[in-house]
Design a protein with these regions (language model features):
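Helical element adjacent to the flavin cofactor pocket in flavoenzyme catalytic cores
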Residues: 88-100, 130-156, 161-204
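Conserved N-terminal/central alpha/beta ligand/cofactor-binding core
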Residues: 1-76, 81-88, 98-99, 103-116, ...
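Short, intrinsically disordered low-complexity segments
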Residues: 110-141
Length: 204
């Protein structure tokens, strides 16, 4: 706060209060059932929908924070989209990761349960995909297909379209795939964001 202009809200509050409120924010979100990582002491970096790295002091549990702007996500990455889904730009992501030295391969996940959505592009949105994935056995089917696509990749990159109602699904997919699995935010609406909003609404 000391290096900010005198009229900046952080300067007006003072360093100690800003630190106190930041710590309280973390506790509050966790008490609401929202999984987060990060510290007010330093920023981490997360991958944006366009593949850029953005500094952030808190990161939702779906996403994998990076320690630096230039950190490689892995040696070889399998970038997996949902067939027909246009709000997850795999080419942008691959270009960005390859600049950091990660070899990328792009594939598409094809599930017959998505056929109805795919017939109408306006329906092929993150929240609608997530609702389908939440049905019994669908995310498990997706995870098995992803695992079967792996060759020698050490990292899988997926759109964050899983676990609209149950954030445990995200961790279960990571376990099922069996290698480092990163979920990257899609263009809005954001499934993790909507889930967090629902958790907050449930508290008030």
């Amino acid at each position: 706060a000391a290096s900010l202009p005198a009229a900046h809200p952080y300067t007006i509050l003072g360093t100690e209060k800003v630190k106190k409120y930041a710590e309280e924010a973390v506790s509050f979100l966790q008490e609401c059932g929202i999984r987060i990582s990060g510290s007010a002491e330093r920023n981490s970096w997360r991958v944006t929908p366009t593949g850029e790295r953005k500094a952030s002091w808190l990161t939702l549990g779906d996403f994998t924070p990076l320690t630096s702007k230039d950190e490689k996500i892995g040696s070889k990455a399998l970038i997996v989209n949902i067939l027909g889904y246009l709000d997850f730009n795999t080419k942008f992501l691959a270009d960005s990761f390859e600049k950091q030295g990660t070899e990328c391969r792009i594939v598409a996940l094809k599930l017959e349960e998505m056929e109805r959505l795919r017939k109408n592009p306006s329906e092929m949105r993150a929240t609608n995909i997530a609702r389908v994935m939440d049905r019994d056995g669908i995310w498990e089917k997706a995870a098995a297909q992803i695992k079967g696509m792996l060759k020698d990749e050490d990292t899988v990159v997926l759109p964050a379209v899983f676990g609209l109602k149950d954030q445990d699904v995200v961790e279960k997919i990571r376990e099922a795939v069996g290698v480092k699995t990163m979920f990257v935010a899609t263009m809005p609406p954001s499934v993790p964001g909507i889930r967090s909003q629902m958790s907050l609404k449930a508290e008030f």
